């Protein structure tokens, strides 16, 4: 009998975001958690390394912190749309967020399990920013979403709003979202 759910994997950038908690699904099976490190490249590498290790994998869940100017600190959000906010080839005639010569859509769309979060856009980039143009911003979700989109894996992303672009707020709130996330995961 499998003591963990082989069809679901949680990816989080840092152990501090999860407090090293063990997450259980609705059948009380452990959902494995892997840590990607910060940023798009680290997230991509970790996702690609994890994929062959879990042959029954159907869903990747990303949990982490995010900044927002319009969603209050302390709220857990299910993101549904992902854009690469720092891809800027506009001088070459490309739209902001669109990778030149890449057939992947500019905005990757997935379903959310949280009601009323169907149009939340997460802007992912390798920089901390205070001028937030999207519903929220992070540093990993788009990278993980793109790997999932390419390989046909379901992708769910939950972001805990830790700050409004202020690094000091982030440091204070980095671990505060784990209990809200744990409640959601226990229903999957």
Feature annotation, model-predicted:
Residues 19-188:
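Glycine-rich phosphate- or other oxyanion-binding loops that anchor nucleotides, phosphorylated ligands
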Residues 12-17:
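Short polar catalytic/cofactor-binding loops
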Residues 2-9, 31:
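Extreme N-terminal starter segment of soluble prokaryotic enzymes
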């Amino acid at each position: 009998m499998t003591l963990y759910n082989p069809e679901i994997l949680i990816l989080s950038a840092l152990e501090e975001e999860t407090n090293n908690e063990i997450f259980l699904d609705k059948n009380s099976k452990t959902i494995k958690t892997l840590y990607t490190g910060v940023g798009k490249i680290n997230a991509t590498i970790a996702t690609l390394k994890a994929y062959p290790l879990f042959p029954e994998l159907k869903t990747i869940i990303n949990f982490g912190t995010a900044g927002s100017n319009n969603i209050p600190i302390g709220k857990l959000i299910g993101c549904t749309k992902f854009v690469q906010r720092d891809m800027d080839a506009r001088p070459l005639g490309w739209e902001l967020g669109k990778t030149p010569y890449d057939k992947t859509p500019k905005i990757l769309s997935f379903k959310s399990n949280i009601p009323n979060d169907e149009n939340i856009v997460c802007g992912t980039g390798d920089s901390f920013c205070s001028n937030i143009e999207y519903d929220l911003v992070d540093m990993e979700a788009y990278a993980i979403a793109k790997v999932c989109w390419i390989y046909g894996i379901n992708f769910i992303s939950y972001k805990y709003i830790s700050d409004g672009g202020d690094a000091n707020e982030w440091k204070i709130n980095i671990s505060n979202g784990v209990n809200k996330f744990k409640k959601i995961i226990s229903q999957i």
